[in-house]
């Protein structure tokens, strides 16, 4: 039994990160597809939800994974190859996936719980002509049936999923680049400051596009950006030292491995020296 316990512990130490990531990812996709939003009351006089419904979004959801996960993963792979360090790539990739999946799950739960109408909600709802123009009404005033996915999604405005996901993925990449390039070292080159701003600029553009498409209110976008970037930073700090650290580009686990190797190597040299002295 003791041997079995050791194997289970070893298995958990090695694969626990993968197991938790898979569980979070599955939960995210299940809740995102199956969970229904809270149907908040609204007013036909509310001009903030009276914008037209855009048939074509500037950044469709199907491209979000490519921009915010696949593209950053390629950059992480490039740094791993450049440094000849596969551990750097795999650990950073896990961080990227954790950042985006944790953010996606939390935002999905929050959006459905809050149930804030989108700026284009009335265009999705198409209220009956007999609906009172004053006062508050509910989803029963919509001529579009509740089973319609477009109407359901109209209650998922806060916070912005596109924006939070963008800053969770591209924000993680920006922090990673700042650390690898040691951006906060004294007398750093100006180009090292510009490079991390590129993914942040792309994430900001995605957030801005959600306002231009009338999918989100400005508060949804601002909170989504802060939330996504905060998760990215927290996840990053589980892997790397602070950005102003002299070894900001080295993984915690890498530093531990290198320190262990140094200690063993030093002990070996010390033993060899003692043996020579005895001879």
Curated annotation (Swiss-Prot):
What this chain does, per the record?
Catalyzes the dephosphorylation of diacylglycerol phosphate (DGPP) to phosphatidate (PA) and the subsequent dephosphorylation of PA to diacylglycerol (DAG).
Query: How does this protein lie in the membrane?
Result: Multi-pass membrane protein
What SUPFAM superfamilies does its record include?
Answer: Acid phosphatase/Vanadium-dependent haloperoxidase
Q: What is its EC number?
A: 3.6.1.75, 3.1.3.4
Q: Give any Pfam family that matches.
A: PAP2
Query: Per UniProt, which keywords does this protein have?
Result: Endoplasmic reticulum, Hydrolase, Membrane, Transmembrane, Transmembrane helix, Vacuole
Per the UniProt topology annotation, the Lumenal ranges are: 1-17, 80-86, 185-187, 242-279
Q: Which organism is the protein's source?
A: Schizosaccharomyces pombe (strain 972 / ATCC 24843)
Q: What is its main location?
A: membrane
> Which Gene Ontology CC terms are recorded?
endoplasmic reticulum; endoplasmic reticulum membrane; fungal-type vacuole membrane; membrane
Q: Which family does it belong to?
A: Belongs to the PA-phosphatase related phosphoesterase family.
Matching entries from Gene3D superfamilies are given as: Phosphatidic acid phosphatase type 2/haloperoxidase
What does the record give as the organism's lineage?
Eukaryota, Fungi, Dikarya, Ascomycota, Taphrinomycotina
Q: Where in the cell is it found?
A: Vacuole membrane; Endoplasmic reticulum membrane
GO molecular function annotations of the record: diacylglycerol diphosphate phosphatase activity; phosphatidate phosphatase activity
- Name-wise, this protein is Probable diacylglycerol pyrophosphate phosphatase 1
What are the recorded Gene Ontology BP terms?
phospholipid dephosphorylation; phospholipid metabolic process
Q: Which intervals of the chain are annotated as region Phosphatase sequence motif I?
A: 111-119
Does the record carry Protein biosynthesis as a key word?
no
Give the region (Phosphatase sequence motif III) as residue ranges. 209-220
Name the chemical reaction catalysed here.
a 1,2-diacyl-sn-glycerol 3-diphosphate + H2O = a 1,2-diacyl-sn-glycero-3-phosphate + phosphate + H(+); a 1,2-diacyl-sn-glycero-3-phosphate + H2O = a 1,2-diacyl-sn-glycerol + phosphate
Matching SMART domains: acidPPc
């Amino acid at each position: 039994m003791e041997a079995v316990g050791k194997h289970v512990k070893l298995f958990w130490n090695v694969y626990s990160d993968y197991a938790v990531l898979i569980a979070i990812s599955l939960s995210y996709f299940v809740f995102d597809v199956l969970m229904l939003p809270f149907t908040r009351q609204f007013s036909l006089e509310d001009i903030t939800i009276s914008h037209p419904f855009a048939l074509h979004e500037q950044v469709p959801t199907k491209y979000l994974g490519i921009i915010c996960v696949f593209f950053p993963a390629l950059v992480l792979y490039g740094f791993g190859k450049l440094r000849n360090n596969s551990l750097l790539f795999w650990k950073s990739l896990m961080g990227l996936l954790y950042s985006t999946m944790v953010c996606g799950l939390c935002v999905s739960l929050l959006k459905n719980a809050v149930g804030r109408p989108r700026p284009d909600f009335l265009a999705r709802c198409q209220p009956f002509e007999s609906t009172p123009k004053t006062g508050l009404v509910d989803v029963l005033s919509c001529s579009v049936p509740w089973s319609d996915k477009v109407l359901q999604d109209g209650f998922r405005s806060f916070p912005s999923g596109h924006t939070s996901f963008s800053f969770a993925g591209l924000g993680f990449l920006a922090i990673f680049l700042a650390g690898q390039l040691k951006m906060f070292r004294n007398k750093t080159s100006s180009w090292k400051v510009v490079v991390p701003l590129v993914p942040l600029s792309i994430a900001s553009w995605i957030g801005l596009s959600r306002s231009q498409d009338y999918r989100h209110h400005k508060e949804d976008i601002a909170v989504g950006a802060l939330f996504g970037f905060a998760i990215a930073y927290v996840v990053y700090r589980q892997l790397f030292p602070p950005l102003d650290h002299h070894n900001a580009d080295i993984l915690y686990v890498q530093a531990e491995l290198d320190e262990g190797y140094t200690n063993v190597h030093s002990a070996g040299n010390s033993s060899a020296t003692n043996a020579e002295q005895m001879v």
